[in-house]
Amino acid sequence: MILDDIRDAIARADSEAFDALLNAEDSDLNAFSLDALLGMCVLAAAQSQSRNESRHQLEIGRLLVARGARADGPLGNERLLQSPLVMPITSLNDSDEIVAWYDLLIGAGADPNSISEVLVDGFRCRMLMLSRVCFFFPVTVLITTEDRFELIKILLRAGANPNPGVCDRALDLSRYGLPHSAAWALDDAVARAPELANDEHYVAAKRLVKGVIAAGSYKKYLRLPLQELLNLLSLAQRGKFATTDPVMKSLVGVDNHVVWNVFTYWVES
């Protein structure tokens, strides 16, 4: 049965065989769930102890997403695996692949604000994915602090809420209770591992999270420097600010809306 062959190819991390099976003339893609196969692939990749196998699992994941597989449903037990985003950060393999998995799964619809449970001092604590990633900052065996910071940026770009419960209508607080914030998770991380206070990626992550909370959103946070530039530009255009910078001089005669659009494009791309 072709479905059994496909499952076997996923388990063996045989991306070439998997691709051939998907493209076979007798392969009926409607006979099975691509979403379920993607979930199976994520689990297999996280449990694999071979980096080579894990890389092939990632390639299989990309093939499934290219075929239309979605990652917007729970992966397993609702309390512990609310999102497929939980599994890559438990992987035994290369942290670069964890980042690639996050890019792939979020692009396929994985919810950056999904809730899962984390054991903290023997108690089950509810955390959004961003808080969970921040909480485990001290764990550097499987993922570098640089790549963990990259995961934080990916989640924030996708709309992750660093401060749950504050103007967040998407959270069912009656069902889950108030999850821990990303700021709390970062503070708790450095309390458990004081050396993080001198880690440039931890410091950058904390500055980013606090900046996003203060600004109200990741997009607003990114635009703060642009707004400051426009404020200076406006002063220069009105003759209240003198500059020797050639770039600023060239911008004085350009409409502010044009300047804003150009710099916003550079930042977001």
Summary of predicted features, one role per range:
Residues 2-8, 30-49, 73-92, 115-142, ...:
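Ankyrin-repeat boundary/"N-cap" motif
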Residues 10-11, 22-26, 42, 46, ...:
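Ankyrin-repeat helical core positions
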Residues 3, 15, 82, 244, ...:
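Generic preference for well-ordered alpha-helical elements
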Residues 9-17, 200:
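Short helix-adjacent coil turns
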